[in-house]
């Protein structure tokens, strides 16, 4: 497997484009084939999520996606669902597609009626620029950004020649479950919808569902995975393993980009729990660590306050014994051990510890010393800017 340029447009059979005008944006991706999706588990579910989930569950295929930024079309009642349907109809009419094979996604402010007339007005401009160049993938990724500071796209080519590419957005209201983000992934492998669905659920659970920026789960999250089947390559059993691994690699890359791009963030936190009795124990603890406002604040302040880490693990619901815990902080290939088998370690190199805490990417490793299961999660520090951004979001 190798990383390649081009984002989703590196995949045969995918054309895309997007425009961004102020806070409003439109993305269109044209690619036809079997498809799978996972969606937010927030019980306050946005209209486009309801529509797109219905498309996936009934058709198991997609012909296109239309997405807008600037308005979530959430908590908008029947009018909101009609607006989502109108978005699908506008695209299907323009491209001569069946409307029940078009997925719709929205991101932005909750509780405000979507201006569909604005979308209809600017849709022709988007469609005129549909293409398969790397620039088209970038334009599509840019148009769905809200408070994101960085574009999020990635593509790989497997040894068998199959390609997978994805774009995503997300920087705030992020604790996927599924959620808080949008991701559109494509492959040219000759695979049916059930294979896509199985690979997607495994990959999402290990990656996007392990990201915490602020602990809030959005109303609009979705990940859609479509195969154009254009490579003509049907992966063998061995290649299917590589296919799943490649999807996990792609989503891990995007998940880390989301965490690093968290609203106001200055540092990426990677937390690892090892030596747990069960995977669920490791998962509970590691997500509690990256979710903890006290841990996140300490990382922002370059404060090696490791007590907050063990406290978060302790209240997470995971089974652990404090006399078995070992804890270290790492960055740039260097590590400082802070706790060993329940005993506080004497840190002789304070300069190294300070150097680690000043790094932009910090790894926290907590070993339970009880088993062989492990889990990894990603988050970011909690800064003054996070409060400012969200205090001023609608005002």
From Swiss-Prot:
InterPro entries: Arg_biosynth_ArgJ, ArgJ-like_dom_sf, ArgJ_beta_C. Pathway: Amino-acid biosynthesis; L-arginine biosynthesis; L-ornithine and N-acetyl-L-glutamate from L-glutamate and N(2)-acetyl-L-ornithine (cyclic): step 1/1. One of its GO terms (biological process) is ornithine biosynthetic process. It is found in: Cytoplasm. GO terms for cellular component: cytoplasm. Its EC number is 2.3.1.35. It catalyses: N(2)-acetyl-L-ornithine + L-glutamate = N-acetyl-L-glutamate + L-ornithine. Keywords: Acyltransferase, Amino-acid biosynthesis, Arginine biosynthesis, Autocatalytic cleavage, Cytoplasm, Transferase. The record marks 179-180 as: Cleavage. This is Glutamate N-acetyltransferase. It comes from Methanosarcina acetivorans (strain ATCC 35395 / DSM 2834 / JCM 12185 / C2A).
């Amino acid at each position: 497997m190798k990383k390649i340029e081009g984002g989703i447009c590196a995949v045969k059979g995918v054309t895309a484009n997007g425009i961004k005008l102020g806070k409003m944006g439109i993305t269109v991706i044209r690619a036809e084939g079997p498809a799978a999706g996972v969606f937010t588990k927030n019980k306050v579910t946005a209209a486009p999520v309801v529509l797109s989930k219905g498309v996936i569950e009934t058709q198991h295929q997609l012909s296109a996606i239309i997405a807008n930024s600037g308005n979530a079309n959430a908590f908008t009642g029947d009018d909101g669902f009609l607006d989502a349907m109108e978005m699908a109809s506008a695209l299907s009419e323009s491209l001569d597609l069946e409307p029940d094979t078009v997925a719709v996604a929205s991101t932005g402010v909750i509780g405000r009626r979507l201006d569909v007339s604005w979308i209809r007005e600017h849709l022709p401009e988007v469609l005129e620029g549909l293409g398969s160049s790397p620039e088209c993938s970038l334009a599509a990724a840019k148009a769905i950004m809200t408070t994101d500071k960085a574009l999020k796209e990635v593509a790989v080519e497997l040894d068998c020649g199959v390609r997978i590419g994805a774009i995503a957005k997300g920087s705030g209201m992020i604790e996927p479950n599924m959620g808080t983000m949008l991701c559109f992934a494509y492959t040219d492998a000759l695979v049916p919808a059930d294979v896509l669905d199985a690979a997607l659920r495994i990959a999402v659970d290990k990656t996007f569902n392990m990201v915490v920026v602020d602990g809030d789960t959005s109303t609009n999250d979705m990940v859609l995975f479509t195969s154009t089947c254009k490579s003509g390559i049907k992966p063998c059993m061995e290649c299917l393993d590589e296919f799943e691994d490649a999807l996990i690699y792609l989503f891990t890359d995007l998940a880390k980009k989301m965490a690093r791009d968290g609203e106001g963030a200055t540092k990426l936190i990677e937390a690892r729990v090892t030596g747990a009795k069960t995977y669920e124990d490791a998962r509970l603890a590691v997500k509690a660590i990256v979710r903890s406002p006290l841990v996140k604040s300490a990382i922002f302040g370059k404060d090696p306050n490791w007590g907050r880490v063990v406290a978060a693990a302790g209240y997470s619901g995971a089974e652990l014994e404090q006399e078995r815990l070992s804890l270290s902080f790492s960055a740039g290939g260097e590590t400082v051990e802070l706790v060993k088998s329940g005993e506080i370690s004497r840190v002789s190199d304070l300069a190294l510890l300070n150097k680690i805490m000043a790094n932009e990417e910090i790894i926290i490793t907590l070993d339970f010393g009880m088993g062989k299961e492990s889990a990894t999660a990603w988050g970011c520090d909690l800064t003054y800017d996070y409060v400012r951004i969200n205090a001023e979001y609608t005002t």
